[in-house]
Amino acid sequence: TWQLHRGEDSKKDQSYFLYSLTQERLAHTIFPLAGLDKERNVRRIAAEQGFTNAQKAESEDICFIPDGDYAGYIERRCGHPAAPGDIVWRDGSVVGRHNGALRYTIGQRKGLGVAMAHPVYVTGVDAANNTVHLGEAEDLTATALTADDWIWSAPDARMEAELDAGGIRVGAKYRYRQKDQAATLTRDEDGQMLLTFDEPQRAIAPG
């Protein structure tokens, strides 16, 4: 059985983005830098080998979107600009218009294009209806999430048994740089996973 583990360098670990690797894919995947720390090892080895980029500054953004314009990239790929739509307050009233729901993310506070007497945040993005939902800070708090697109990268009979027996205690995160959050993983009759956190979490977003 092939397993996906976290890299030695926690600041550069990519396992969060590789969750969907199946056994078939893992069997053909090699991570040559997994056991190395970038600053202590990788840069030193690169310098010793005469690599010209050994001390090159790092890029923190997606490499194929160097200008950081994610919305523009998606629009170009789709071949048309994002459609405008309604910005909706927590009571259902329309409080503004947006120029593309893809430009908003849950928890966002700045650049909303809506002026109100108190701080407001994006609490939901409804792509199907092309609406952006706003609310207050308290509306961003949740204690659980459901997972539709989940995968066991390494099937484990013991974990399956624990899951069916009442749940598995896990350390989970829903954001790349986030520290592990204590939670319990359970599965309902339809096979959908439910992750219940020990402590309330802020701005849980799909994806």
Where are these regions (language model features)?
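Nucleotide-activated chemistry modules centered on ATP-dependent adenylation/adenylyltransferase
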Residues: 1-206
